[in-house]
Amino acid sequence: MWYSDYHVWILPVHERVVRLGLTEKMQKNLGAILHVDLPSVGSLCKEGEVLVILESSKSAIEVLSPVSGEVIDINLDLVDNPQKINEAPEGEGWLAVVRLDQDWDPSNLSLMDEE
């Protein structure tokens, strides 16, 4: 698992396919997640642009995508259960799956450690 400067984790699941989610640290900073606005399956995301909007007990934030590609799956469970992000941000609280528009090369990303 890789951690982007956008506080989004990146988990390769297949060749040129990654799962994305909010880091543990960011979900703690946000407090209770109350609402999630997910992208549409089939939509395109671009590195550094808004992927997801989260509303929490403390604020609303735009979560930026650390990669570019096509959204091929979203976590629909979050629509009715946004608290899954708080309960398991690096597990069942994942946000989206993206098919990358280029080969996976983490050295091209701006990365940080888990903290």
Curated annotation (Swiss-Prot):
Record's GO cellular component, any one? cytosol
Gene3D superfamilies noted in UniProt: 2.40.50.100
- The set of disulfide-linked cysteines is none
Q: Which residues carry this modification: N6-lipoyllysine?
A: 58
Give the note describing cofactor binding and stoichiometry.
Binds 1 lipoyl cofactor covalently.
Q: Which domain of life is it from?
A: Bacteria
Q: Which cofactor does it need?
A: (R)-lipoate
Kindly indicate whether the keyword Zinc belongs to this entry.
Answer: no
Keyword field: Lipoyl
Ranges of residues in domain Lipoyl-binding:
17-99
What's the protein name? Glycine cleavage system H-like protein
- One GO-annotated biological process of the protein: glycine decarboxylation via glycine cleavage system
Which family would the database say this protein is a member of?
A: Belongs to the GcvH family.
Q: Per its UniProt record, what PANTHER family does this chain match?
A: GLYCINE CLEAVAGE SYSTEM H PROTEIN, GLYCINE CLEAVAGE SYSTEM H PROTEIN-RELATED
